[in-house]
Amino acid sequence: MSSTSASPISNITVDDELNLSREQDFAEEDFIVIKEERETSLSPMLTPPHTPTEEPLRRVHPAISEEAVATQLHMRHMAHYQQQQQQQQQQQQHRLWLQMQQQQQQHQAPQQYPVYPTASADPVAVHQQLMNHWIRNAAIYQQQQQQQQHPHHHHHHGHPHHPHPHPHHVRPYPAGLHSLHAAVMGRHFGAMPTLKLGGAGGASGVPSGATGSSRPKKQFICKYCNRQFTKSYNLLIHERTHTDERPYSCDICGKAFRRQDHLRDHRYIHSKDKPFKCSDCGKGFCQSRTLAVHKVTHLEEGPHKCPICQRSFNQRANLKSHLQSHSEQSTKEVVVTTSPATSHSVPNQALSSPQPENLAQHLPVLDLSSSSSSSEKPKRMLGFTIDEIMSR
């Protein structure tokens, strides 16, 4: 039953008022939502209510969400860092274990090769140790090669109390130790003399003039005088002096030469003018040095004099040949001519064989170092003389 009020203004009961108040509340909320939607929407038509998102929550509790995200990231970083630390520790423990295993193997394995010498070691003892080790390994290696070549001989005639060494136990001389051995011996035994195993005659097969690094030079021997040359062209030119072969001839004057460069020098005389002329005879020359040599021939007294007969020569080569004739004549006179007093006093002495002291007394003293004074001797000019040019 519903209770009614006695007010004459309206006939509204209490239940009706409660229902009206509820309807008004709902209507106000709906009005607010509709009003907000109308403000934000572009069309005048009604739209469904706005779906709530995370933005209102962040607006209400902004500090709590940032702290939660920061703590989660920090925990992840800490877990990753701890995992890396554990992996590094495990790797370090594995390395230490491997090093310990290698050290144990090195201590257990026997030493295969001799210890290389140091600066403080005795050089003589080190050298002896290396040589003994090399000789022993060489003998074992040679014995093994013989066994491989003749296996049946060792099978029938081998003694049981001399077992053959196993091939795995043979340690031949390492190839890399040769260079090390040479370097060490050069440092410790630099002053020691080398031993020649081939004897004085060089029986080892290596030429005496050839070194370990230098290549021996080729030798070309002349078949006429056995003179040696290092180049075949020089031997060919030399042999033409024996055969007097002159394959290069001048087209103008017909003069022949042994060498092509001599012909080229000769053609230079024909092809060019002769600006240098002699003032005495009027002869022209291509070069000034040739004219200077020619002027010596016009001197009344040559610059080179013989110390025995005072004969003068224009060229030093002519003086040398003249002095040789004096020496031959003096030796013949001393051998043939003897004094009569010497022959009667010493009858048993041979007349044709004088003593060396007497021979030295009779021979004239020849001074070839200074044939004339420095003032009279002209300065030696570079190049060829006229006689040398004409003798080609």
Swiss-Prot record:
GO BP terms: blastoderm segmentation; embryonic hindgut morphogenesis; embryonic pattern specification; imaginal disc-derived leg joint morphogenesis; Malpighian tubule morphogenesis; negative regulation of DNA-templated transcription; negative regulation of transcription by RNA polymerase II; pattern specification process
GO molecular function terms noted in the UniProt entry: DNA binding; DNA-binding transcription factor activity; DNA-binding transcription factor activity, RNA polymerase II-specific; RNA polymerase II transcription regulatory region sequence-specific DNA binding; zinc ion binding
Disordered: annotated span: 142-174, 320-356
Keywords: Activator, Developmental protein, DNA-binding, Metal-binding, Nucleus, Pair-rule protein, Repeat, Repressor, Transcription, Transcription regulation, Zinc, Zinc-finger
Tissue expression pattern: Has two temporally distinct modes of expression during early embryogenesis; expressed in seven stripes at the blastoderm stage, then during gastrulation the seven primary stripes are supplemented by secondary stripes which appear in alternate segments. This results in the labelling of every segment in the extended germ band. Also expressed in the embryo in distinct regions of the gut, the Garland cells associated with the proventriculus, the pericardial cells, the lymph glands associated with the heart, in a subset of cells in the central nervous system and in select apodemes.
Sequence ranges of Basic residues compositional bias: 150-171
SUPFAM superfamilies: beta-beta-alpha zinc fingers (SSF57667)
Function: Pair-rule protein that determines both the size and polarity of even-numbered as well as odd-numbered parasegments during embryogenesis. DNA-binding transcription factor that acts primarily as a transcriptional repressor but can also function as a transcriptional activator, depending on the stage of development and spatial restrictions. May function redundantly with odd and drm in leg joint formation during the larval stages, acting downstream of Notch activation.
Biased segments, Polar residues type: 336-356
Segments forming C2H2-type zinc fingers: 220-242, 248-270, 276-298, 304-326
Subcellular location: Nucleus
Primary localization class, coarse: nucleus
Keyword DNA-binding in record: yes
Protein name: Protein odd-skipped
UniProt xrefs under Pfam families: zf-C2H2
GO CC term, one of those recorded: nucleus
Higher taxonomy: Eukaryota, Metazoa, Ecdysozoa, Arthropoda, Hexapoda
Domain of life: Eukaryota
Family assignment from sequence similarity: Belongs to the Odd C2H2-type zinc-finger protein family.
InterPro entries: C2H2-ZF_Transcription_Reg (IPR050717), Znf_C2H2_sf (IPR036236), Znf_C2H2_type (IPR013087)
This protein's encoding gene: odd
